[in-house]
Amino acid sequence: VHDVFITSRYVIPGYYYMLEGSPTSASNLEWMVTEFFQAEKKLAEADGKSVYDVCNEIVASTGPKDSGLIFLPFLYGCNVSLDGKACFIGLDGWQKRGHVLRAIYEGVVFAHKWHMDKLLKHRDMPDSIRLTGGAARSVEWVQIFADVFQVPVRIPAGTELGALGAAMCAGVATGEFDSYEAAADAMVSFARTQEPN
């Protein structure tokens, strides 16, 4: 398969995986917080909260059809074009930070959709998708994923899921589990599932 980023053999004999990726994810929100939300970060920390919780509240209070603002999430590069740059399209003076934050959340989701569309040329859409990482900690962001992909989004329990995968492989290698499927059945659980609107 030549039109996806990485293809390789999978740990289960006879299976292969395809991977798409680019630096277009939660680092975009991190940039926004670092550059423009330092006062909110200090206030949130004083209240025992995360500044990302504040961002989620702001996004939740901003409707998806409130502004039409578009964000291209290429702050750290773009695998679509070497010259691809991040930008806001449709930014007007009346828009507030909620519009900008929601545009960042949506821009990241649509970048993931671009990757998923490439992968779906080679298989059917799954009944659900699993999401991990920074965006998975945000109910608001996960809801945007569910709404854009129009399938349930399942969030695995835990935070260090790469280490969990390594532990499952070790469990199979040492004979603790008979198969990767058995290891996954025993070790993977889900914190929540969000349905599309």
Which residues does each PLM region occupy?
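Glycine/Thr-rich phosphate-binding loops that ligate phosphate moieties of nucleotide
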Residues: 2-197
